[in-house]
Amino acid sequence: MPIRHCIVHLIDKKPDGSPAVLHARDSELAASDAIENLLADLNDSYNAKQGKAWGFFHGESGAYPLSGWLKQYLDEEKDFTAFSRVAVEHLQKLMEESNLSTGGHILFAHYQQGMTEYLAIALLHHSEGVAVNAQLDVTPSRHLDLGQLHLAARINLSEWKNNQNSRQYISFIKGKNGKKVSDYFRDFIGCQEGVDGPGETRTLLKAFSDFVESEDLPEESAREKTQTLVEYATTQTKLGEPVTLEELSSLIDEDRPKAFYDHIRNKDYGLSPEIPADKRTLNQFRRFTGRAEGLSISFEAHLLGDKVEYDEAAGTLIIKGLPTTLVDQLKRRKD
């Protein structure tokens, strides 16, 4: 993962309304194994975070100046240090306006993964721990706690430069503690949400369920295709990459690689060619299966409590919205 530029600044602020004090670094960090490891760990932690949102820049203005400064840097009108300095000064002002905000180390990193260039911006905090030194004494130890990554954003610079119509070249972590805590960071980035990750994922899974039903697939085949979808989408989220519908379609049915893709387009689900999959929504899409005495039952986990009701005390399932093929068979048997 080539790192083009990297720098860290410190904003010292407590969540009590006190002023934010900036301690700015005046030069980039030199390349080192430690920086490589930090960026790799940061990427892993960021990709694993649930509840991210995707969007695009507001128009450049006094309220949202970051995109303009970033463009100046990419056009070589500013160097990376100058860009990061003016950006962190703006973040300092926004922090002072948000009483609940807490300071920390602000990391700016311009790096490349594959053929794609990214800018990562993250607010990092330390955790207190212990270590054993060379004299075998137990001593206090401070380390960056990437597991507690709450405010961070990643800008796909290649997508921003090459696709003017994209609405998902920025991803950012949505705060869990309410609007007041995290909105200042989103305003700092100047991002507006353009893609509903959980909603797009639910639509994808609905399209897949409809596809499986329309194909009238055997239980084993349906289970294998479901597993393929979940594994591919989960892998993409871990890599921080979107789900590509054409690639997914070819994995689901190697003999008919366009079948699922054509189903999505023909039914007009409104899905983009690439969608940011939501990990939490994917985890609800596992299948429950069971066989006993000539009975075979298989359904997707997200249907539990909706089309499928389980009564644990009675040991029964109530299934609503039966497949039309099954209803027809039952009617013929009755007649």
Curated annotation (Swiss-Prot):
<dbReference type="GO" id="GO:0005737">
    <property type="term" value="C:cytoplasm"/>
</dbReference>
<comment type="similarity">
    <text>Belongs to the YejK family.</text>
</comment>
<dbReference type="Pfam" id="PF04245">
    <property type="entry name" value="NA37"/>
</dbReference>
<dbReference type="GO" id="GO:0043590">
    <property type="term" value="C:bacterial nucleoid"/>
</dbReference>
<keyword id="KW-0963">Cytoplasm</keyword>
<dbReference type="InterPro" id="IPR007358">
    <property type="entry name" value="Nucleoid_associated_NdpA"/>
</dbReference>
<dbReference type="GO" id="GO:0003690">
    <property type="term" value="F:double-stranded DNA binding"/>
</dbReference>
<protein>
    <recommendedName>
        <fullName>Nucleoid-associated protein PP_0973</fullName>
    </recommendedName>
</protein>
<dbReference type="GO" id="GO:0003727">
    <property type="term" value="F:single-stranded RNA binding"/>
</dbReference>
